[in-house]
């Protein structure tokens, strides 16, 4: 029978706990940044934006139609997958940096307030500017695909 959680190396120092806590949001940031060229490559190679049945909803979400008669519009699904990838990583990173309870933001703020505010603003600025319409994942991906392909 397993003994459960066993402390082997003593208490974790606040600094190391902060490093571990900030790793989650930074992973979301990394996935967001890596996702941009990956999705531009995928959408550019497949020509998904050349397909005319994907109307743009002004907030950046595509108001997608996945079925057209008897055919499945995989291009719309592919575009939405890229959009959701970018949205999800930004929103999850911001949510995780909320300095409350078990979320990583509380641990990061306990370790270093300057690190907390830096990472929090890295997520907050793009999310707020996205909701006010200054940019959208759809426009970002479409613009880069049109520029490169």
List PLM regions with ranges.
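Hydrophobic transmembrane alpha-helices and their immediate loop junctions
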Residues: 1-149
